[in-house]
Amino acid sequence: PSASNSKDTTGANNDANMTAAQGTFYLQAGAFPGAPIRGAAGCCLAPYDIPNAHTFGYDVVSNRSKVAAYRAPGAPIGAYAVECVLDEVAEALKMCPLEFRLKNAAKEGTKAVHGPTYPVMGYVETLEACLSHPHYKAPLKKLQGRGYASGFWFNAGGESSAQVNITEDGNVVVTTGHPDIGGSRASIANITAELLGINVNRVSVLIGDTATIGFSNLTGGSRVLFASALVVTESTNQVIDILKDRASKIWNIDKEAIEWENGEARPAGDNAGKFKPLTLVELAEQATPTGGPIGAGHQVNTVGAEGGFATHICDVEVD
């Protein structure tokens, strides 16, 4: 959280097309530089297709405690200013605030104010979902008001490492380099269990340090699950390949003739032979005679993260 002073000017023509926008954001950093000006200046206009736009951020140092990221640092500050002004513009045009946003929404191919050209993205879909939702059409009672606002965050990829090991009793231990700041361990366990076709209760997720796992970049809500899920998925798929190899040794058939389904190695069709499926537990019990411990690790520098969009409807009653 950061104290702030925001100034936003947005123009639109009589056809309700946004023509220009300019935002200036003063964010307090505390005793040392590092206010989240990128989040405020970079995210505030991201949902919109504006031909002329400029944002500027000031990193203001003050005699107070240093600020630090909580969630989407700076973005809510910038969005609050811009979204309030958009409501005022829509009111001046006698237009529904959501319809005004939809008319000016960024789409695939839009050149974003903060730089990139958008690929497939979902901002329009959030607006359409709100417009078709019962909440939007519900009548307001006395002293009630309804507000709308949209938001954006960049998201990120980066380096992540993971190790997946099968224990002797057929359970699974996953080690990653990311502390859990919002439920990522549960998500990693579910991803691993789904790939292996086993109950999630059989998967344990450990947080390794630099002495036990490969390098993993900082843990932020906008990258941790995107990056760690990809690396855990690859590690788990490698483990499945090893399990199929072990089954091929037991059955004395080619690994390519084996499929992994619902936590079991099975012959991939009648031509592969008639064999009773081998469960993960059974393969783990035979790990030593078929080749030794079963496990795999993977490291990746994840790319391809795309931004996320959201639109909210909120009612307020004043007594």
Label every PLM stretch briefly:
Residues 57-67:
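The feature captures the short pre-catalytic strand/loop hairpin that immediately precedes
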Residues 1-52, 60, 81-84, 91-93, ...:
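Cofactor-centric catalytic regions
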Residues 66-78, 221:
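A short glycine-threonine-serine/GTX helix/turn-capping micro-motif
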